[in-house]
């Protein structure tokens, strides 16, 4: 069985590292303690895990991300709900403005001077602007509240996931990575 060049390079580097460690320790240049040994073992584990289990982690994470995205799609989109509400409010305001304009036009001119007509129009415009500002604030408030609710539920889910001691360390690391990906999407506005 022929080894690939990257495998051969990795083996050569490992062999060279072992030889240099042995040479340095025999000359008493490098002194080992428990922390150094643990750190070297950890680095070796990370390199081994990345090479041998990299695709397994990727497939598992992709599956979890897909499942989370499917669950998130079941929630109603707050932007659509607020947009429908704002369209309805605008339609009602237009109708009210038309009715008020008709009422003002139907008043006899003797009782309603041109100044009064301008005052009514100014009042209606001001009311319309206040409603529009309120609606804009409601949209942004609802969006922020939705994101905060989602983040809170995520933290709760993460806490419940770690509450059970039967979960392995690898599963915990995998779950943390998934959670971070989704939280970045939420905080960055990656989905609407």
UniProtKB/Swiss-Prot annotation:
The chain crosses the membrane at residues 29-49. Keywords: ATP synthesis, CF(0), Hydrogen ion transport, Ion transport, Membrane, Mitochondrion, Transmembrane, Transmembrane helix, Transport. Its main location: mitochondrion. It comes from the Eukaryota. One of its GO terms (cellular component) is mitochondrial membrane. GO terms for molecular function: proton transmembrane transporter activity. InterPro entries: ATP_synth_Bsub_B/MI25, MI25_plants. One of its GO terms (biological process) is proton motive force-driven ATP synthesis. Pfam families: Mt_ATP-synt_B. It is found in: Mitochondrion membrane. It is a single-pass membrane protein. This is one of the chains of the nonenzymatic component (CF(0) subunit) of the mitochondrial ATPase complex. F-type ATPases have 2 components, CF(1) - the catalytic core - and CF(0) - the membrane proton channel. CF(1) has five subunits: alpha(3), beta(3), gamma(1), delta(1), epsilon(1). CF(0) has three main subunits: a, b and c. Belongs to the ATPase protein MI25 family. This is ATP synthase protein MI25. It comes from Arabidopsis thaliana (Mouse-ear cress). The gene is ATP4.
């Amino acid at each position: 069985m022929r080894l690939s060049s990257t495998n051969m390079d990795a083996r050569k580097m490992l062999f060279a590292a072992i030889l240099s460690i042995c040479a340095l320790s025999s000359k008493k240049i490098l002194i080992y303690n428990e922390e150094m040994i643990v750190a070297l073992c950890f680095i070796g584990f990370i390199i081994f895990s990345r090479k041998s289990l990299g695709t397994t982690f990727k497939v598992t994470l992709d599956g979890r991300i897909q499942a989370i995205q499917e669950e998130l799609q079941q929630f109603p989109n707050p932007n659509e709900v607020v947009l429908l509400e704002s369209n309805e409010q605008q339609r009602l305001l237009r109708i009210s403005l038309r009715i008020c304009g008709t009422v003002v036009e139907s008043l006899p001119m003797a009782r309603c001077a041109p100044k009064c007509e301008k005052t009514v129009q100014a009042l209606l415009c001001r009311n319309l602007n206040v409603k529009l500002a309120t609606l804009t604030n409601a949209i942004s408030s609802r969006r922020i509240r939705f994101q905060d609710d989602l983040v809170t539920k995520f933290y709760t889910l993460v806490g419940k996931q770690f509450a059970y001691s039967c979960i392995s360390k690898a599963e915990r690391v995998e779950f943390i990575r998934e959670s971070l990906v989704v939280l970045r999407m939420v905080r960055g506005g990656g989905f609407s």
